[in-house]
A protein has these predicted regions:
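Small/aliphatic-rich secondary-structure junction motif
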Residues: 2-50, 73
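Charged helix-capping and loop-helix junction motifs
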Residues: 21-22, 54-55, 89-92, 118-122
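Solvent-exposed polar/charged
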Residues: 26-29, 68, 97, 127
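Residue-level recognition of beta-strand->loop/alpha-helix junctions
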Residues: 39, 78-80, 137
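Structural beta-alpha unit
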Residues: 68-104, 111-112, 123
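Glycine-rich, Arg-bearing micro-motifs that act as flexible, cationic patches
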Residues: 103-129, 140
Length: 140
């Protein structure tokens, strides 16, 4: 049913992903799917990396570490943006088609009142692509 799973990764906030990583591993093993870990960074130095190449190396290391856990094929794909916060949703939507993704698994937060004004990334991605989107909330 699913062949290519995409997992958006924010290397500055890996702890937010913890609840979704087990789901990613289980789904990938169940469907014998490959996993693409996708990151979006700026061209300017930031808290994670000084350059997009350094960011890619760190995302690749993260992907390989996850491969050691679940054994499924992994790739890392980095997109650069002048404003990652403003552009992340559009970049993720475009990458789904570019990478031939059929399932996106994203960590999400508990609903907040602010979501009415500023919807979540997962909600935007789900409404702008044909791929299935699985949102994983943090466990208490």
């Amino acid at each position: 049913m699913f062949n290519n799973i995409m997992v958006p990764v924010d290397l500055a906030h890996i702890e937010v992903l913890e609840s979704s990583l087990g789901v990613v591993a289980d789904m990938a093993k169940h469907y014998d799917a490959s996993i693409t870990y996708v990151g979006v960074t700026s061209n300017a130095p930031n808290s994670v990396a000084r350059t997009p190449d350094e960011y890619h190396q760190k995302l690749e290391a993260f992907a390989q570490k996850r491969h050691d856990v679940h054994g499924q094929p992994v790739t890392a794909k980095v997109y650069t943006s002048t404003d990652p916060v403003a552009n992340i949703d559009d970049i993720l939507v475009k990458s789904i088609d570019e990478l031939d993704i059929d399932l996106v698994i994203m960590a999400t937060h508990l609903p907040r009142h602010l979501d009415i004004v500023m919807p979540s990334h997962g909600g935007k991605v789900a409404t702008h692509t044909d791929a299935s989107v699985f949102l994983v909330r943090p466990q208490n």
